[in-house]
A protein has these predicted regions:
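Short polybasic amphipathic segments
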Residues: 1-15, 19, 23, 90, ...
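Positively charged, low-complexity intrinsically disordered regions
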Residues: 90, 95, 240-243, 342, ...
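Residues in intrinsically disordered, low-complexity segments of regulatory proteins
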Residues: 21, 94, 101, 108, ...
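Charged- and aromatic-enriched interaction segments used to assemble
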Residues: 98-102, 119-301
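An acidic/polar, Gly/Ser/Thr-rich interaction patch typically located in mid-to-C-terminal regions
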Residues: 44-78, 200-238, 275-483
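Generic structural motif
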Residues: 7-9, 23, 30-39, 47, ...
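Surface-exposed cap/loop segments at beta↔alpha junctions
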Residues: 1-18, 28, 36, 42, ...
Length: 483
């Protein structure tokens, strides 16, 4: 089926139809009385230290003819197979006036239609509230009886159980199992196929896990992701509306993950490395550097951690002390300077770490692997760093030599992309190619622009894009393959 364009809904398709038929509702040649006044998109998380939550979007519409009014008996969307109703698929796409392509910015489902009658009764105001795949997964409760998991061992009857006693699963396989049980994909052997999820670059094996009846599929997935490396491994919704599950190497070495083995193509992960900065930086290479329009940063104590502990569910009282890093009683410059700033990751289902080197996979045990999580935390958060709190972008006229870079960023920037920032400040400070990664995305559109666009051609969104970003890791040496 054709990809969505503009603001599109899939009126006639089921909620989980993998190839929906899209109707663009802001196309005046299709629905001349419908005008989109604007939209707001919010996805991701504020920083890497919080768990990613579901994304949402709102679309504000003026409906002069009642085309999108479900009480209109003669409207175009009233038949049983082509009807205005909740949980139809929805997409928000942005036109790139330089490259002349549509870029999907949000894909999900209509949660709510909210109608406000104008006092003149000549027009309706409609607000669409959209949700993403997290909402779908959060409403899938896991029940015993065969739909979810494996036959439970003795003593766990009545629970939902994944795994087999005394065995381990690869983390990506566990997540694919859960998604398959939730009817969001299929597994043929070890080959997972889904229109709604992509899972890759996980580097650990996980213990069997037991869930109480009523726990959600989303909670089980997030627990498995945390086994890879809490905070750094991530499950989020990408701009195509898919649940994207990335392991730690997707941040440590994105180029290596893309290269493989196995290689990852851009239909699975449309990763970009952006170069952004002030006007002087953009003028060095207008075709490749995108101009920042809003910028602020913080240098504070919030993310400091100089004493950490991470341990698996298999830990014992006798081995617990060994999971602290640095070891108890060890003095460090950070502790001396700032006092103890603690972080912990308890009861992880991590069973083994997997390391591929020279075509050979070696494994670490659960205690060793989770201890590395504590090492990573202290190595990368033991000192305060400069964190960007505001970074924003705006469109330019299509003929501007700087327009191509910024319109590509406006259309294709996504969670997990790398952003190198160059913004000098008075006195010689500032940022010079500082590496950050996108954690969250916020987009506010207040209408359409036609500057520099020929009569009858597609306009482009009057949009402000702001990003939540995290600093790139400083030290990942603890995750090198064992000798």
């Amino acid at each position: 089926m054709a990809d969505p364009t503009g603001i599109s809904l899939a009126f006639g398709d089921d909620t989980l139809e993998p190839n929906p038929v899209w109707t663009r509702i802001d196309d005046p040649s299709v629905l001349p009385g419908v005008r989109v006044a604007g939209y707001q998109i919010d996805r991701g998380r504020a920083s890497e230290t919080t768990r990613t939550e579901g994304g949402s979007a709102t679309v504000t519409i003026t409906d002069r003819d009642g085309a999108l009014d479900p009480t209109n008996p003669t409207g175009p969307f009233t038949t049983p197979t082509n009807k205005i109703q909740p949980l139809v698929q929805a997409a928000i796409c942005r036109w790139n006036p330089v490259d002349l392509v549509w870029d999907t910015r949000f894909r999900g489902w209509v949660a709510e239609y909210d109608y406000t009658f104008d006092p003149s009764q000549q027009v309706n105001q409609l607000q669409l509230t959209l949700v993403d795949i997290f909402e779908i997964l959060a409403t899938v409760e896991m029940y015993p009886g065969g739909d979810f998991g494996d036959p439970p061992p003795a003593g766990s009857e009545g629970q939902v159980y994944y795994g087999a006693p005394a065995t381990v699963d690869q983390a990506n396989y566990r997540i694919e199992r859960i998604l398959t049980d939730a009817r969001l994909g299929t597994l043929a052997g070890t080959v997972f196929t889904s229109a709604f999820a992509v899972v890759f670059s996980l580097n650990v094996n996980v213990w069997p896990a037991t869930y109480s009846p009523g726990e959600t599929a989303l909670a089980a997935i997030q627990e498995t992701v945390d086994a890879e490396l809490p905070e750094i491994a991530n499950a989020f919704t990408d701009r195509f509306g898919r649940l994207a599950v990335h392991g730690r190497q997707a941040k440590f070495n994105p180029g290596g993950v893309l290269a493989g083995p196995p290689p990852i193509d851009n239909t699975v992960w449309d990763w970009h490395h952006w170069y952004v900065g002030d006007g002087d930086f953009v003028n060095l290479n207008p075709a490749a550097h995108a101009q920042i329009r809003q910028f602020a940063f913080n240098h504070g104590r919030q993310y400091l951690a100089n004493s950490a502990m991470a341990y698996p569910v298999s830990v014992t009282d006798a081995t617990m002390n060994g999971q602290v890093y640095p070891a108890a009683g060890t003095a460090t410059p950070s502790k001396t300077k700032y006092g103890i700033r603690s972080w912990s990751a308890p009861n992880l289902i991590t069973a083994q770490g997997r390391y591929l080197s020279g075509g050979v996979t070696t494994v670490t045990d659960a205690l060793t692997e989770t201890h590395r999580f504590a090492q990573y935390k202290v190595a990368n958060y033991g000192l305060p760093v400069d964190r960007i709190t505001t970074i924003g972008f705006r469109p330019l006229l299509p003929a501007d030599p700087r327009a191509g870079a910024v319109h590509r960023l406006l259309g294709k920037a996504d969670i997990s992309d790398q952003v190198d920032v160059t913004v000098p400040s008075p006195g010689g400070g500032g940022f010079n190619g500082a590496v950050f990664f996108i954690e969250g995305i916020h987009e506010t559109c207040t209408g359409r622009l036609r500057g520099g666009v020929a009569a009858g051609a597609e306009g482009y969104d009057d949009v402000t894009l702001t990003l939540d970003v995290s600093p790139g890791p400083v030290d990942t040496s603890m995750f090198t393959p064992p000798p």
